[in-house]
Amino acid sequence: MPCYCLPGGLQNRAYCIVTSNKQHMVISDSRFVPPQQEGGKADIVETITAANTLQAKRLFVTARNRLFDIARWGNISEGISASFQLADKNGHIKNGLPQVGDHIRINVPGPGSSAGAGYDWVRIEIVQEANEPDKEFAVIKVRPSAAPEKQKGTAHFFDSAATSSFIVNREGRHISAEIHGRNEKPNMETEKVTDQIRNFVVGAAATEGFAKIQWQKLAKGILKVQTTRS
């Protein structure tokens, strides 16, 4: 069995960790993951199991910090093709923790959305954390939105009924990174025909599995630990 070293200066100690991509939803609260009603959906779940609770808590903190460091999602996700930037309600790039009302600016390969000045945009609707002795979680829920400077329309290849929920969860020794997409349909309610064509092509590719591949890379990156052999 492979052994992994905890990041953050603990490379002198090896801990055995079991990895898995068992597809079950750990978080089922409809506030965080809305009901599926129409269009496509995605459920990505990656899990690791720590040797003990102390190690699990440390791994959770690392994963939680990666979840909230949105600008580095592309850096921690091997092979992901999109890039992400956290922006405030006015569209200005910002550092620090995400807040409700902030936006995420997404740069998808290929032609960009003219409605979003070349980018796709989502607005953060929920940022929530909970910490209990044997259970912890952190959640970011987003929805396609207008570009901040326009405040109308939807500058995204999915329409505004879609949501994406990004979750890090710990129960005992088990830590999961989850990404749940709901009600994903191409955004055809745009002013320009070129945007409609682009959104149909990109949105269809996303619902057919391309987005799932990208999100799985992000989930793996959030949970990634450095490996050594004992």
Please provide the spans of the model-predicted regions.
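Mixed-charge, low-complexity intrinsically disordered regions
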Residues: 3-5, 15-103, 109-116, 153-230
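Residue-identity detector for glycine
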Residues: 8-9
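Short, solvent-exposed secondary-structure boundary/capping segments
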Residues: 128-145
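Short beta-strand-centered aromatic/proline hotspots
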Residues: 117-129
